[in-house]
Amino acid sequence: WIMGHMVNAIYQIDEFVNLGANSIETDVSFDDNANPEYTYHGIPCDCGRSCLKWENYNDFLKGLRSATTPGSSKYQSKLILVVFDLKTGSLYDNQASEAGKKLAKNLLKHYWNNGNNGGRAYIVLSIPDLNHYPLIKGFTDTLKQEGHPELLEKVGYDFSGNDAVGDVAKAYKKAGVSGHVWQSDGITNCLLRGLTRVKEAVANRDSGNGYINKVYYWTVDKRATTRDALDAGVDGVMTNYPDVIADVMNEAAYKNKVRLATYEDSPWVTFKK
C-alpha cells in the first residue's frame, strides 16, 4: 500500500492517486463536543508541505465517496484504503467514546450512504492515544445499533503513538479488538527514525500469535528510506511523494518481491510468504 500523506482537500485525492497512491491518509479534527469537524492538520506539519488545506469533514466524506464508488464520474479504482488520522488530542479522555459514536454516524451517512452503494474503500481508524481506546467501542456499537454491523468488515484500527508493542496489545484487549489491526511506526519527514520498532512490529505480525495484521512506516520521502522499509518487510509506506515509492518498487531488487495492493487483497489478512 502506497499511502498518500495528509490528503485533506478533496482535489488532493486525485492528485495523490494519479502519482501512484492506492491509499490516502486524512487528518480529522474535532470540535469541543467531539464532533468530527474538519479534515485539517495545522502547523507544524511535514517539511515541504502546506499544513493548512482543509474541508468540512462531511464534505470530504462525500468527495471521498465519489472517488471510491464504482460508476461515479470521479471514481478512482486504485484507491482502496483510507486512514483517518484522528486528532483526538483536543478531546478529554472521557469524550473518546462519544467521538467514536459521532464518527460512525458521519461515515454511515456521508461515506457509506446508509449502506446503499456507498464508497467501497477500506477504512482504518488511527488513534494517537492508547487511553482513547473507548473510541473504538463507541464506533462499533453505533454501527451495530444503526443496523449496519456488516460495514465493520470494512473497518480496521491503528494506534499511532509509537507506544511499546505490548502496551498497544493491552489497549486492543480492552477495546475488544482482535483482527483488522494495522500498526504504524514513524515520525515526521523533518526528522530521522530508525527501524527498530518497525522490525519488532513485523516480528509480532509474523509470529502467528501476535495482534498485528499489517505494518506501515511513515513518513517516507526518500528512495533509501523506502528501500530500508521494504527490506524490513512493511506492508505500507506513507509518503508525500507516491511516485518515489512506485519508482523504488519497480527497481530490479523489488519488482518481483512486492507489488501494489488491489481491492482483492484484504487489508486485514496477514500476508504469508
From Swiss-Prot:
Main function: Dermonecrotic toxins cleave the phosphodiester linkage between the phosphate and headgroup of certain phospholipids (sphingolipid and lysolipid substrates), forming an alcohol (often choline) and a cyclic phosphate. This toxin acts on sphingomyelin (SM). It may also act on ceramide phosphoethanolamine (CPE), lysophosphatidylcholine (LPC) and lysophosphatidylethanolamine (LPE), but not on lysophosphatidylserine (LPS), and lysophosphatidylglycerol (LPG). It acts by transphosphatidylation, releasing exclusively cyclic phosphate products as second products.
Residues that hold Mg(2+) according to the record: 25, 27, 85
Domain of life: Eukaryota
Active site residues of this protein: 5, 41 (nucleophile)
Keywords: Cytolysis, Dermonecrotic toxin, Disulfide bond, Hemolysis, Lipid degradation, Lipid metabolism, Lyase, Magnesium, Metal-binding, Secreted, Toxin, Zymogen
Protein name: Dermonecrotic toxin LhSicTox-alphaIA2av
Free-text tissue specificity from the UniProt record: Expressed by the venom gland.
Record-level Gene Ontology MF annotations: lyase activity; metal ion binding; phosphoric diester hydrolase activity; toxin activity
Enzyme Commission number, as recorded: 4.6.1.-
GO biological process: one example: lipid catabolic process
Xref: Gene3D superfamilies: Phosphatidylinositol (PI) phosphodiesterase
Family from the record: Belongs to the arthropod phospholipase D family. Class II subfamily.
Enzyme class label: lyase
Subcellular location(s) per record: Secreted
Cofactor note text: Binds 1 Mg(2+) ion per subunit.
Catalyzed chemical reaction(s): an N-(acyl)-sphingosylphosphocholine = an N-(acyl)-sphingosyl-1,3-cyclic phosphate + choline; an N-(acyl)-sphingosylphosphoethanolamine = an N-(acyl)-sphingosyl-1,3-cyclic phosphate + ethanolamine; a 1-acyl-sn-glycero-3-phosphocholine = a 1-acyl-sn-glycero-2,3-cyclic phosphate + choline; a 1-acyl-sn-glycero-3-phosphoethanolamine = a 1-acyl-sn-glycero-2,3-cyclic phosphate + ethanolamine
Cofactors demanded by this protein: Mg(2+)
Key word Ribosomal protein present: no
